């Protein structure tokens, strides 16, 4: 497992405990994460006032929640390690959908599952000038993320997961806008 895929989870679990959470926490995660979190909690002599339910996912597309209010599907991504994206679809009167495609190479097959999504978050680790690095590391460029948004007929595209080599993130937005105009840079606290 890559650390940037889960390092925030132990802090979130601890925060929920400090705030007095009592309701079970369901964690849908890649295989191996339960072992890591359990080891971290044991070594830190940590505990929670609520139950952690781990649902370790295979590397495939599947429905994980389907009730009257929401449908949540996993999306099989293409990264150096097994990695899943997610599609969240509300079933209420005003249907809202959100696609989350984290670490993945350019994967046009995603477009069918993401068809007409309201908001698409897609990683764009590299600019197109470094597309050879994107291919090598199984990540995407801003151009490739924009192509996925365009082909899937997304309403909005949010770009994120930028390589630290880039200082000016507006270059990502400018690259993507040439293909998909309704593009934003992911910023903490921003509402889209």
Located regions from the model:
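Short internal beta-strands
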Residues: 24-32, 158-159
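Binuclear metal-dependent phosphoesterase catalytic core
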Residues: 186-192
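A glycine-rich helix N-cap at a beta->alpha junction
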Residues: 44-57
């Amino acid at each position: 497992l890559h650390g940037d895929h889960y390092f925030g989870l132990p802090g979130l679990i601890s925060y929920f405990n400090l705030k007095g959470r009592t309701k079970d926490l369901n964690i849908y995660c890649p295989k191996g994460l339960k072992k890591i979190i359990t080891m971290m909690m044991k070594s830190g002599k940590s505990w929670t006032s609520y139950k952690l339910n781990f649902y370790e996912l295979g590397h495939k597309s599947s429905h994980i929640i389907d009730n009257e209010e929401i449908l949540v599907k996993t999306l099989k991504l293409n990264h150096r390690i097994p990695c899943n994206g997610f599609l969240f679809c509300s079933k209420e009167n005003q249907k809202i959908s959100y696609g989350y495609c984290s670490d993945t190479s350019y994967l046009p097959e995603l477009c069918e599952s993401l068809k007409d999504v309201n908001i698409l978050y897609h990683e764009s680790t590299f600019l197109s000038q470094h597309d050879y690095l994107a291919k090598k590391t199984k990540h995407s460029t801003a151009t490739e993320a924009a192509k996925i948004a365009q082909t899937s007929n997304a309403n909005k595209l949010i770009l994120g997961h930028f390589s630290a080599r880039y200082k000016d993130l507006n270059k990502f937005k400018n690259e993507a806008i040439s293909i998909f105009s309704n593009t934003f840079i992911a910023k903490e606290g921003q509402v889209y």
